[in-house]
A protein has these predicted regions:
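Adenine nucleotide-associated cytosolic modules
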Residues: 1-247
């Protein structure tokens, strides 16, 4: 049941026929995990809070640095040196005090990933390296948690929605495994744009709608302002999601 304040706060969302009060109630009872609070994570977390996702867990192991401020808009100069998860929790709570925001200051590893994502209904990728993404991908496949992958570089970005048992996983897309990350340049508006698509796909899942990018890879190129969507196929010999592995 939505109270009077919630009916007022989310009024513009409630007017959407595909959303309505039932969709808002579902969001209120949902739990999203945002792993990585860089340019992607800052933006997606902000819109989850604004939209009324009731429970949000933020995971990161880094502190705010001056070089973050061109794209990580939750942090200001006065926050330099502070833990990102705590700064984000503090500021997001001021945007919407009704949301439970849980900070986890930790680096994702193969040993801790299962305990960290326990209870997630959707895991949203805010990471900056493929090695950690593949760890999260494997855990989500095993626990049957939808995983919204995204990556950005320079003026480009991409996103896909991974539904365990139904779509290709990240290891299908990157079968060769780990590669370097975090060293490429990026303009701040690119992660913000892609992260908003992540938030939209997540919200669709949480309110019971079909995501638009399941089994599809959306690419954006800011150089010519073009979008491209490609079908992606499951790798039947994937070491993570093939039937032989998951059964």
């Amino acid at each position: 049941m939505l109270n009077r304040n919630e009916l007022t706060r989310y009024h513009r969302q409630l007017l959407i026929p595909e959303f309505g009060e039932e969709g808002q109630r579902r969001l209120k009872n949902s739990h999203v995990f945002v792993i990585g609070l860089g340019g992607l994570g800052c933006a997606s977390a902000t819109y989850f809070v604004a939209a009324g996702v009731g429970h949000i867990t933020l995971v990161d192991f880094d502190v705010v640095e001056l070089s973050d401020l061109n794209r990580q808009v939750l942090y200001w100069e006065e926050d330099i040196g502070e833990k990102k998860v705590l700064v984000a929790q503090r500021k997001l709570s001021k945007l919407n005090s009704t949301i439970e925001i849980i900070p986890i200051f930790a680096k994702i590893t193969k040993k801790n990933v299962f305990s960290i994502i326990d209870g997630a209904q959707v895991v949203v990728d805010g990471l900056d390296n493929l090695a950690t993404r593949l760890i999260v991908n494997s855990a989500c496949i095993k626990h049957k948690i939808p995983y919204i992958y995204a990556g950005v570089s320079r003026l480009r970005g991409m996103i896909t929605t991974i539904i365990p048992g139904k779509t290709p996983c990240l290891a299908c897309i990157y079968p060769e495994g780990s590669r370097g990350g975090g060293g490429l340049g990026v303009l701040g508006v690119i992660p913000a744009l892609i992260a908003n698509f992540q938030a939209l796909e997540s919200i669709k899942l949480l309110i019971g709608q079909s995501p638009s990018l399941a089994g599809k890879l959306l690419r954006f190129n800011g150089n010519d302002m073009k979008f491209r969507i490609d079908e992606i196929k499951r790798n039947e010999s994937c070491k993570v999601c093939s039937q032989e592995v998951v059964k």
